[in-house]
Design a protein with these regions (language model features):
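Divalent metal-dependent hydrolysis catalytic cores, especially in the metallo-beta-lactamase
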Residues: 1-6
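Aromatic- and histidine-enriched alpha-helix N-cap/loop-to-helix transition segments
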Residues: 8, 95-99, 245, 249-252
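Alpha-helical recognition segments enriched in aromatics with Gly/Pro capping
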Residues: 10-221
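Helix-loop elements that line ligand-binding/catalytic pockets
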Residues: 198-200, 204-208, 212-260
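Single conserved hydrophobic/aromatic residue that forms the stacking wall/gate
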Residues: 261-270
Length: 270
């Protein structure tokens, strides 16, 4: 139920940066504070990028005052037009990686169980979060001492195209809900594995609607049947979902149940 705002955790961010400087993982230069990437040997483990790939794929600015091209900003100076806070390095603001690490530590404690995000955030954002967190209060030799599990979701496209306001193809849940029940919308979204992309089209939502209706039909026809009446080869939903939250696999099994429902006895469906 916590929805932290970055501006409410500036002291925690400054505290994190000070600790990194004291432990020689970061340095101050021209009003900036930067994390020195070569000091953290596990950098790149999450994204599985080598040194050259890290530099090529990094979004960080290559400034002349950096000790290393891969070094990223923890704190940067603010102009009069930009938001800023007093700090040991002058008036400035935190880098966005710093914000996430500080708020996670303060609100959840370390380590926390699951860290989610889009797959585009694996590098450099999540890689940087791990580095600065493991070099402070978490364990430097154990990347999972910050977050135990990382879940990166794919993107939703529309009929093969990127969903974007500029293309005018944005579909809002509230609009879908005018024609489809929430269960149908959720099932449609779960039809693709969370790590993969989902191409949204009418076929996806129609298939989900059809499956939901069929499952309710089966349920209504099985009312009054006790557990002992049911097939011993029950659907093991938990085991399927334990396999990296394999929702498409579970939906496949639900479809198989619907096929079995056409057998002479509805009991055979379970």
């Amino acid at each position: 139920d916590i929805q932290p705002k970055a501006t409410e955790y500036i002291p925690e961010m400054i505290e994190l940066i000070v600790e990194l400087i004291e432990k020689d993982f970061a340095y101050e230069k021209e009003g900036h504070v930067l994390f020195h990437v070569p000091t953290y040997q596990n950098y790149g483990k999450l994204s599985k990028r080598n040194r050259d790939e890290q530099i090529a794929g990094s979004r960080v600015e290559v400034a002349p005052f950096k000790k290393d091209p891969a070094d990223f900003v923890l704190w940067k100076p603010s102009t009069d037009e930009q938001p800023g806070w007093e700090s040991p390095w002058g008036v400035g603001r935190p880098g966005w990686h710093t914000e996430c690490s500080a708020m996670s530590k303060k609100t959840l404690g370390l380590p926390f169980d699951i860290h989610g995000g889009g797959r585009d955030l694996i590098f450099p954002h999540h890689e940087n979060e791990i580095a600065q967190s493991c070099c402070t209060s978490a364990s430097i030799d154990e990347p999972d001492s910050y977050a135990k599990y990382w879940m990166h979701n794919g993107f939703v496209t529309i009929n093969g195209e990127k969903m974007a306001k500029s293309l005018g193809n944005i579909i809002l849940v509230k609009d879908l809900a005018e024609n489809y029940h929430g269960e149908v919308i959720r099932l449609a979204l779960l039809s693709s594995h969370y790590r993969q992309g989902l191409d949204w089209n009418e076929k996806v939502i129609h298939q989900a609607n059809k499956l939901i209706n069929k499952l309710y039909e089966i349920k209504d026809n099985l009312d009054g049947i006790t557990i002992s009446d049911k097939n011993e080869n029950n659907l093991d939903a938990i085991s399927i979902l334990m396999d990296d939250l394999n929702t498409p696999g579970l939906i496949t099994e639900l479809n198989n149940i619907c096929l079995l429902y056409t057998s002479p006895s509805p009991r055979d469906a379970l």
